[in-house]
Every structure is written in C-alpha cells, then in structure tokens.
Amino acid sequence: MSVDEILTLAQGVVQSWDWATEVSRPRPERLDVKVKEIKQLLPIIVGLRVKRLGYLSAIVGVDLGVEANEIEVIYYFCPESAVIALRVRVPRQGATLASLSDVIPSAEVFERELREMFGIEITGLHTTDHLYLPDDWPDGVYPLRRDFDRAAIAGAGDEV
C-alpha cells in the first residue's frame, strides 16, 4: 500500500469517531488526529491496531504551560513511512489516562515515563516503579513540566 492509501484507510478508521476528533493532513505522509474526548482514545487505537496501521513508535508529553493548564499527550503510530499522531489534552492536575499495555505491551515504558516526568496517572500499569528518576526523588516534582524548580530536588539521587 502507498502512504496515501495507508493514511486514507487510517482516516476512515478515525472518522468513525468524527464527533470526538479533528483530523488534518499537515504533510502528505502525516495524519494528525486531535482526540477531543479522552474516553475515545483507546477505541481509536484499537481500531488502528485491528487494521494493522502501524506500530506504536512513541508516546510523548508536551506541557502547554501553567496558563493553558494542560498537558498534550501524543501517541505516534508509524505504518511504513507514514506517521499517525493521536493528540489528547489532559489537565495538569489530576490527569488520568488508561494504560494501553494490555493491547500494546511496549506502551508501558512510555506510560511510565509520562507518569514520572509529567505526573499523569496511568491506570492499569503493571509496575509503577521509577523508570529514570532515583528512588528518593520527591513526590509531586515532575522534571519535564515547564514550572519545574531545580531547588525542589536538592539532594535527590545522592544516595549510592
């Protein structure tokens, strides 16, 4: 299948949730999907998986700042040389997303990173141990948030 055929098929899957999504093609090889209702994220991902439309290449967080009071989470799927980006916004405080690890086992490492670096609670994780940060890292301090304060971590990670 060509890249255009792949993305057209993916767009067809996503359009099943047209009330909950906004779709754009910013470049010929890319499909961007803004998921407006968090509860629709998992069914859309399952729909893409059923059609074998790529592998999960990354889940990334982007802190939109204190003023926006949101974090955007982007799920990247790569079928061949195409890119499908599913974007969902969550509140900076008390954000919760369901784990994809039962559907896509490799998602767990990305989800643990979101939890640790941005403070997004991921329900259904198989382990909640620290992935990158030291065990004595202070609770409630998230290093990839824009308002991260280095003074809050004085001494963290000093134990050997």
What is the meaning of each model-derived region?
Residues M1-V160:
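Terminal low-complexity/charged segments
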